[in-house]
Design a protein with these regions (language model features):
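Amphipathic alpha-helical scaffolding segments comprising HEAT/armadillo-like alpha-solenoid repeats
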Residues: 6-9, 41, 164-165, 202, ...
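Alpha-helix initiation and capping sites
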Residues: 4, 20, 36-37, 52, ...
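Long, low-complexity intrinsically disordered regions
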Residues: 2-6, 12, 35, 45-49, ...
Length: 384
């Protein structure tokens, strides 16, 4: 039996796009014809899933015996050694399909963690012959002091290509419980991740100083950038994106004091609907210039194709609110308009409700910070 590792991009893509039993059967038969142990291992797992009673128990035993005999070839000797550590599951959560890794989540479980490093676990998982079809990777905090994501990102970058990856979440942590967003100072490069995963469908990045270069990708359907300070060049990249498959976009802009820059003019291409023909949900939120965003969106070309809009968590209190109130016909086709966590006055809330009815979500509204003498300050919800 040859070492595991035979690759067939066409069959792998078929499973990634539609993991039906028939697709798996064809794939495992091909692997078996190549002498790859995952062919026999996969066919045993398929047969077990169809079996019942004593036959199922027998196949379960056969699989355990097969894994014991061929574990190094199936999973890699170094990963098997690492998995013997009782603490491995504290840093790595792995789901599988017929034994092959399907989803992976890695993170440091506690502040003073001294067990297996999450980045080490991820590196060994990614090198494993069982990792060839991984669909989803979630990267949490690699360290707590200082908070770090980059070590996990570096592992993915070293992989060079992840052709079957469909979903990537960098920054899978709870804030502020685990850390503040602004404390993540890695400056994750969204564009680099898109290059590593040519068939990615969902990219979610949470952290500070997110970098965005030329934002072009053929298959990305969902993009979420959560930050307390999106740099000006990143805003410009979002505004000029070319994402023909994108249906869901959510961007947090943040506060100037935490690195936020840019202005609504730099979003002109996006608001014109250029490069995003399938976009149905648009969240432009958590901004210091939320009024400008709201006013521009009301008069934009992209609005007509949207089903839901999220303008929450910002500083909206003036011309943006008035633009919404004055143009209900342009917004009435929406299923939902989220204006929560802004600075709408009670009077504005009542007028918005009267204009748009049940499609608008008001939620909680903030009160401006009064520095005295009529000096009112308005802040986006998440900076730090």
């Amino acid at each position: 039996m040859r070492p595991a590792g035979s690759r067939n991009p066409e069959l792998e893509a078929a499973i990634a796009d539609n993991p039906s039993e028939d697709a798996w059967q064809v794939y495992f038969d091909w692997l078996q014809s190549q002498g790859d142990p995952w062919g026999e291992r996969g066919n045993l797992a398929l047969a077990r899933d169809k079996a019942k009673g004593a036959a199922k128990a027998k196949l379960t035993k056969q699989i355990a015996e097969f894994d014991a005999a061929h574990g190094d070839a199936l999973f890699g000797a170094s990963l098997l050694e690492l998995m013997k550590n009782d603490y491995f599951t504290e840093v790595a959560e792995v789901s599988e399909q017929y034994g092959l890794f399907w989803t992976v989540r890695v993170r440091s479980p506690e502040y003073d963690w001294s067990g297996t490093a999450p980045s080490t676990a991820l590196a060994e998982l990614m090198k494993s012959p069982a990792a060839r079809l991984i669909q989803q990777i979630n990267i949490g905090l690699m360290d707590h002091d200082p908070p770090d994501l980059q070590k996990g990102v570096d592992v993915l970058w070293e992989a060079e290509s992840l052709p079957n990856l469909r979903s990537l979440f960098i920054g899978d942590f709870e804030y502020p419980d685990d850390t503040e967003i602004s404390w993540i100072e890695d400056g994750i490069d969204a564009t680099a991740m898109l290059k590593v995963a040519p068939r990615l469908r969902s990219l979610h990045i949470r952290g500070s100083g997110i970098q965005v270069g030329t934002l072009e990708h053929d298959t990305l359907e969902r993009l979420i950038l959560e930050t307390g300070g999106l740099p000006e060049d990143a805003v410009e990249s979002v505004g000029s994106c070319r994402l023909p498959a994108l249906t869901h976009m959510e961007v947090w802009f943040g506060r100037e004091g935490y690195g936020a820059g840019g202005n609504v003019e730099q979003l002109a291409g996006l608001l014109a609907g250029e490069g995003v023909p399938k976009l149905r949900h648009l969240g432009l939120k958590n901004g210091d210039w939320q009024d400008d965003i709201a006013s521009a969106l009301v008069h934009s070309n992209v609005l007509a194709q949207l089903e839901t809009v999220d303008l929450s968590m910002g500083t909206m209190h003036g011309n943006g609110v008035e633009a919404i109130i004055a143009n209900p016909a342009k917004l009435s086709h929406l299923k939902r308009l989220d204006l929560s966590d802004n600075y709408l006055s009670n009077n504005q809330v009542e007028r918005v409700k009267a204009a748009l009815g049940t499609i608008v979500e008001i939620g909680r509204q903030k009160k401006p910070y009064d520095r005295g003498g009529g000096d009112l300050r308005y802040y986006a919800s998440v900076g730090e």
